[in-house]
Structure formats: C-alpha cells, structure tokens
Amino acid sequence: MNFEFEREIGFINSQPSLAECLTSFPAVLESFQTSSIKDSTAIPPPFEHTIPSLSPCTGNQARPRSQKRTASNGLQLRTQTAPPTQHQQGPAPLSGGAPLAHEFPWMKEKKSSKKCPKPGATAAAAAASPSQASSGYTTAGLESPTEIQGGLDNVSGSRRLRTAYTNTQLLELEKEFHFNKYLCRPRRVEIAALLDLTERQVKVWFQNRRMKHKRQTTHHRDGQEGEPSGFDLLEGTDASSPYSSQSLEVSGSGSAAPSESETCPTTAAYTNSSDKSQPTPEEGQASQPEPASVPDTAVHSPPYPTPTADNPTTMAEGRAAGPEHSFTEPQDATSLPDLNFFSTDSCLQISDALSPSLQSSLDSPVDFSEEDFDLFTSTLCTIDLQHLQF
C-alpha cells in the first residue's frame, strides 16, 4: 500500500529514471553540467525509497522511518528522509569500489546516437551485481563515456594525417602512371594489394598526380607559345630548306657570274641552317633572289658565317623563293658597289664535302630528291666546326 501511494504522488512515469537519482547527489551535479540534468532537479528524490529491493543497505535504515510517518503525508516525509541517504551514499561514488550497474534500455538509446559506443558498452558489460547500482554507475559508467566521447570528437575534428609513401611505392606508382593516367578498379585493387596500400590511397594519389601533370603540361605549353625553343626553330629551318636547296637557274640579264650561281646552290642552305642569319638586300634587277651570307675577308672559310656591318653579304639569283626572314624588296645595283661574290674555289671546297650524288645534282637544274636532301642536311650538321671563322 505504501509503494502504490508513493507512486501515485511522486512518480508520473511507469518506470523510474536514473536521471532522478542523479539530482540527489551534489558530487554528481558538479561533474555533470548538462542542461538536461539541471532541469530535472524539480523531480522528487531517487527511487531507492520506492523500490527498496534495489538498495538493501538504505532500505533497512530509511524504510522503518518512512513506514511510520507516511500515513500523514508521504510527500513531505520523503523529502525529509532524503538527507540521510545523501550522507550515507555520498562517499560510495567517490570510493569507486562499487560494482557497475545493469544496462537499461534508455542507456542503449543514448549510446546508439553517438558515433563510438564501444567504450560505454565495455564499461556496462563489466557489471557484476545490482547492489548499490545507481550510485556506482553514476560516476564510472556515465562520466567516462562522456569524457571519452569528447576526446574522440577532438580527434575526428582534427585534420587527417598525410600518407607517407615509401620510395618503392612512389616508384611503382610513377611507373604505372607513365603507362596509364587513369586506373580501372581491378587494376587499382591489384596495385593497392601489391604496394600494401588501401584502394583509397591509390585513388587519391592518382588524382593528385593527374593534377600535377596537368599543371606541368599547361605551364610548358604557355612557355612554348611565349618563346619557341631551339628544337622548334631547327624543325622550321628543315621545313624551309627544301625551297632554298633547289637548283638555281641563270637569268639572262643582270647576272654578274652565271657559273657561280649554278655551281654554288648550297650557299642558300647554309643561310637557312644558321637560325640567326640577317636579311640582306638584293642585287641587280632579279625578281627572285636567293640570300647567302658571306663575309669579305673569309672567302676561303667553310659555311656558317655571320654577317656584320663591316662584312656585307651577297645575294645570288635563282628561281627558288628564299626563307620567310629574307627581304624581297628590289634595290638598285648602285647601292652596293663593293660586293664580293663567292669564288668557285670556295664552292668546290663545299661540294667536296658532299656525296657524289649531290655533286651530280648540283650540275643539273633538276630539283633535289628527298633522299638527297636528307643526306645534304645531315652533312651540314656534321661539318667540322673547328674551321669556322665568325
């Protein structure tokens, strides 16, 4: 009768909650600073008085006094009998010697909402007996999961550490990237198992490597557009040299030395092979000239001369068009009174270094074939540079 009377007066819920028990201990209130616990202080004191079987120690002492006085007013007497329980059970949570409590359903729901319920589950699994259950579980079972959870939140909120790849792993990944910029999933799994990496690490490494390759390619392309390299210039001269390596025809009028223009068609090729050759004006009334850079004092020297202000260059007449950087504007012959031409001896020295097939082609007005031109350009590249006089 006493149990039913106190249930109707003190407890609205059908099952008592452990949160009501927490309000009666000052030590627990100091350690637990959540708002939900503070709001629950208006709820009556713990349920050991209503269910004495859960706490046999307090039931033997507080129960006889409550049975005598609950007939007059049960609610007031329960508030009076609460202070003795504070002094009796206050040292028990601090000692930590009490075993842990049984796990209730509301505890399971609270832990399932958290990310890592394993520490709380292991603490609850170590419960031995239900004696002094509420007070023991208050300190050991509820405070430690909260502290552990706070530590886990700090760890998960921190930045993930970078993967430290070994030299062997980097070498294998670079080799694979050289052949395949994109990996299919079976190959990615195979590489991850081979290099002792996770599939995610291999995928992220290839993503970063593709971005690095893209940046390098874009930067290299921008540099190519701004300033062409020497290899590109060499290719440009090779492409323009067939036009200048064609055999020359002698024009009837305005030709100072017809035989020289026939026997020295290679001077135009030397002009093209030198990338920084300067344009020179034409001589005479020819409409289709061919440039040739030759200094005054170095008539006997091999090719690759560089024209200077003291050494003006000469222009031979011919049918083939000159390179793009040569001038085609005609000028009067009187503007260049002291021009020296290639002598036949220097042309013969140049032609001696060439193959016999090229020597025969020099004498004929027929254009060079592709094979002769390839051999001609290779011979120009292998001329001894020790005899050059700049």
Curated annotation (Swiss-Prot):
Stored Gene3D superfamilies: Homeodomain-like
Motif window: Antp-type hexapeptide: 103-108
Compositional bias ranges of the Low complexity kind: 118-135, 244-262
GO terms for biological process, alphabetical: regulation of transcription by RNA polymerase II
Keyword Transcription assigned: yes
Stretch list, region Disordered: 40-73, 81-100, 108-155, 211-338
Annotated Polar residues bias: 52-73, 263-290
PROSITE patterns, per database record: ANTENNAPEDIA, HOMEOBOX_1, HOMEOBOX_2
Keyword set includes Transcription: yes
Localization, UniProt: Nucleus
Keywords: Developmental protein, DNA-binding, Homeobox, Nucleus, Transcription, Transcription regulation
Annotated GO MF terms: DNA-binding transcription factor activity, RNA polymerase II-specific; RNA polymerase II cis-regulatory region sequence-specific DNA binding
DNA bind region: 158-217
Domain of life: Eukaryota
SMART domains according to UniProt: HOX
Example of a GO cellular component annotation carried by this entry: nucleus
Reported function: Sequence-specific transcription factor which is part of a developmental regulatory system that provides cells with specific positional identities on the anterior-posterior axis. Plays an important role in the patterning of hindbrain and pharyngeal arches.
Family per similarity comment: Belongs to the Antp homeobox family. Proboscipedia subfamily.
Name of the protein: Homeobox protein Hox-B2a
Lineage start: Eukaryota, Metazoa, Chordata, Craniata, Vertebrata
